[in-house]
Each structure stands twice: as structure tokens, then as C-alpha cells.
Amino acid sequence: MCTYRRIGYEILAAPNEEKQTVNAIFDSESYLPVYEKDLMQARKSIYIASPGLNKNKVRRLIALVEEQQSAGVIVTVITQPAESYLQTRVEPTKALQTALTAAGIFVVPQPDLHTHFAVIDQEIVWYGSTNLLSRDKEDDGLMRIGSRDVALELLEEIGR
């Protein structure tokens, strides 16, 4: 964490409600309100790379972005194909992917996806170990970066 501080990041234990902090590091307990606010303030596009899918997180995403989609925001989820899961998880994962598609969210299967990030309006980047559409782990963390260059580089990596 000291290295991140030296290059301009600050660690947030409790997010500031008034101003969205850019170039900050969040833990699994502090990121959600700021991340969700970013999703709800999207004006053009949302890309979420999440290898895993969880029913509660998928439902929450669908509800959060419904208004933005009505205003023309394109939402895309990049995730592993359902067939790459254990046999017992294939059908539940297909159902979650179908729910996303039915809600107007583009689902892009990408085999061997292991990165976790979100890019909002090609400007705000959330990047780290947190699987944004699956379960949070206690030691997960995310960086929130305001950088068009980083956003475009991540989108290029996934072919967008």
C-alpha cells in the first residue's frame, strides 16, 4: 500500500459522499457505494469484466443500470462462458447470463478471463482483485482511477 501512496493514491476507509474520489484504493467493505454511484452516473457506456457471476450481484446490476440504459447507456458484461464452470454451475450461470441479456445487457463470453475491472464512460476505471459480479472476499481490493488512457488500454485487451 505504501507504493500506491507514493504514486498518488489514497486509501479510503469511508468514502466521501459529496465527491467521488479518483485515484483511490478501496477494500471490500468500502468500494460498493462509490462504485454503484459511478454506475448510476454513467452517460455513455459501462463495461464490466467479471470472470464469475453471482445471482445477487447480477440482480443488483440490472436494477442499478436500468435508468441509464433507458437514456442510451450501453452496458456490456465480459465473463467466462458458462461451459467453463464446473458441471453443477453451468445451468445456473447460463440462467444469469440469460437474465443479463434479457435486461438489455450485452454478454460477451471470454474464455480464460481472469481480470476484474469496470470501465465507465471510457474514463473511470475500477481495477483489482474484486470480482465485481460475484462474491466479495475479505482481502479483495480495488483501485478507482480516472484515466482515459488506462480505460482504453483495458478495453483494447478485451477486444472492445
Question: What residues fall within each predicted segment?
Answer:
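A conditional alpha-helix N-cap/helix-loop micro-motif detector
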Residues: S28, K55-V58, V107
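Short His-Asn-centered micro-motif
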Residues: I48-P51, I78-Q80, Q110-P111, I120-D121, ...
